[in-house]
Amino acid sequence: SLGIPMIDVNHLQGHVLVHFIKEKPEDTTPPFPFLCLLVSGGNSQIVKVNAYNDMEVLGQTIDDAAGEAIDKCSKVMGLGYPGGPIIDRLARQGNPLAYKFSEPHIPGLDYSFSGLKTSFLYSLRKWVQDDPDFIEHHKNDLAASLEHTIVNILMKKLRLAVKQTGIKHVAVAGGVSANNGLR
């Protein structure tokens, strides 16, 4: 109605391809095909990228996304929102092997983070019942262990995708890609 042309842009494809925006046009061609681990507050996907407009989702979350799990666990700890930067900062000072949280055992390349959230919540409830100051005294180790578990879940499936497809080039995109443990 305004007489202005509309350009169709897929937000998730933008995340996948943003790596290839360069100053010199000749430097912008991605090494097709490649895999992209797309992780954010709303999405956890493994995408096979064949060309700029040819992408195939090989695996995705069947419930909560990785970033959503981080945000919710941060909230349960009373750390605030968004939880990603907070958990990332605390994890740098913690022991990633201090606590063991549930990891899903689902076939294929799909992700699930709801079991991890439940495991984290129930563990915290038990520990806080025994020691009301538990979170404050152990927040660095809790953050590091949570981050370690989430990265482990993400990487297991990504390694499987590399093995299944034979594609060696991998990009990581989305807000959770800023996490130091994932990098």
Where are these regions (language model features)?
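Short beta-strand-loop/turn "lid" adjacent to the catalytic site in phosphate-handling enzymes
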Residues: 1
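Conserved phosphate-binding catalytic cores of ATP/NTP-utilizing and phosphoryl-transfer enzymes
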Residues: 4, 9-34
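A cross-family phosphate/adenosyl-ligand binding-site feature
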Residues: 6, 36, 81, 98
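Glycine-rich phosphate-binding loop plus the immediately following alpha-helix
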Residues: 10-13, 50-95, 117-118, 122-126
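Short beta-strand scaffold segments in enzyme catalytic cores
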Residues: 17, 36-38, 44-48
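Glycine-rich beta-strand-to-loop/alpha-helix junction loops that act as flexible
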Residues: 40-42, 170-179
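A contiguous, well-structured pocket-lining segment that forms one wall/lid of small-molecule binding clefts
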Residues: 89-170, 180-183
